[in-house]
Design a protein with these regions (language model features):
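Intrinsically disordered, low-complexity activation-like regions
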Residues: 1-18, 23-121
């Protein structure tokens, strides 16, 4: 389960970087991560490994999923990084830095945001 989540969530991001395909496995990775958490697999792992189960939550463009991610990452070294992601999702409902790759039109506010430091990951 952990290995499959890593392959779907992390490998696809790196193998297909700068293409829409980089995000194509996100729904499946999130579904597997949700199931792993439901079954308590994350609680049986060291936090350094459990973090990889939680990463699909961080990569999601859903406000609801980020509410869950905030709780999952609480107390972990990745917590502040999750909060940085959540702020963007709360503000825009998506990651503006993905717009061009995914063929989405950016709003004027998103375009302004993209000129700011740390607007992308």
């Amino acid at each position: 389960s952990l290995a499959e989540i890593i392959v779907l969530d992390q490998f696809s991001r790196n193998i297909y970087r700068n293409t829409a395909q980089a995000f194509s496995q996100d729904p499946q990775a999130l579904s597997l991560a949700q199931r792993a958490i439901e079954l308590g697999f994350d609680k049986k792992l060291p936090s350094s490994q459990a973090a990889f189960i939680y990463m699909p939550f961080m990569h999601s463009e859903s406000k609801v999923i980020h509410q869950q991610a905030e709780q999952l990452f609480k107390g972990m070294s990745n917590y502040e990084f999750e909060l940085k992601h959540k702020v963007i999702i709360d503000r825009f409902g998506r990651y503006p830095h993905r717009n061009a790759i995914l063929g989405r039109e950016s709003t004027p506010e998103e375009l302004q945001f993209l000129t700011e430091p740390n607007s992308s990951f």
